């Protein structure tokens, strides 16, 4: 594991974790392009999201501090927000634990990732079209997230277990459809990332953390990846919230459709290659050969997972 790989992964994680474009899908493709096959490398793909979680904590530190103090004082708004986050967290946590192996076996491949990117892109464009026809008049505050809305967002987040769907996309769209304003849906999505991504990272560390720590340069790669993902994610959060208010979700929808179509085309092209290339493609893909990387994903089915 080279530290430069950790920098690339950290930049990509920070850029895509909170954008509705699927960080998992992007990391799967970058990891294959870099030739990551070891358990340590794949664990790093998951663990560096702690940097993004820390960025949320820092960016929303005033909100979090106010909520914690309010819970101590039994402030109704603070208690409602904390319980809403817990309600929204539970569905994906339960589904992830129950179906983790099945999801990894059947959905972690270029075909499912491409399909999720394309379907999610059309969904975002459709929701954005509805929103533009009806001005954003949803509940304006995250404190307005009722338990019913929280459960709706939580069940929507379950679809993010499908690599390529995007946790950010499913929770923001779920919030909008449940009656929240775009701003409130986005803020709730960011806050929900703290328990969701934190739990996913702890789960993977417990299972595979030793492989990363024992790997040559593993600790250095972890520190570098965390630092880079934190710095990039902190910038992305601020820019994305302003961008979302002005332009909405549609541009990200078109990006998802274009990327999904490209991945699907590369995957189909690699699978239709001459049969004699099969033996070579079963080995780790060389750096820079994107088509071979996509084909390697299809053949091995061995990818980083997020429970």
UniProtKB/Swiss-Prot annotation:
Membrane-crossing residue ranges in chain numbering: 40-60, 79-99, 107-127, 183-203, 219-239, 249-269
Membrane-protein topology: Multi-pass membrane protein
Gene Ontology MF annotations: undecaprenyl-diphosphatase activity
Enzyme superclass (EC): hydrolase
InterPro entries from the UniProt entry: UppP (IPR003824)
E.C. number: 3.6.1.27
Places the protein is found: Cell inner membrane
Chief subcellular location: membrane
Claim: Membrane is one of the keywords in the record: yes
Pfam families linked to this entry: BacA (PF02673)
Catalyses which reaction(s): di-trans,octa-cis-undecaprenyl diphosphate + H2O = di-trans,octa-cis-undecaprenyl phosphate + phosphate + H(+)
Listed GO biological process terms: cell wall organization; peptidoglycan biosynthetic process; regulation of cell shape; response to antibiotic
Recorded GO CC terms: plasma membrane
Keywords tagged on the record: Antibiotic resistance, Cell inner membrane, Cell membrane, Cell shape, Cell wall biogenesis/degradation, Hydrolase, Membrane, Peptidoglycan synthesis, Transmembrane, Transmembrane helix
Family of this protein: Belongs to the UppP family.
Extra remark beyond the main annotation: Bacitracin is thought to be involved in the inhibition of peptidoglycan synthesis by sequestering undecaprenyl diphosphate, thereby reducing the pool of lipid carrier available.
Database matches in HAMAP family: Undec_diphosphatase
Biological role stated in the UniProt entry: Catalyzes the dephosphorylation of undecaprenyl diphosphate (UPP). Confers resistance to bacitracin.
UniProt protein name: Undecaprenyl-diphosphatase
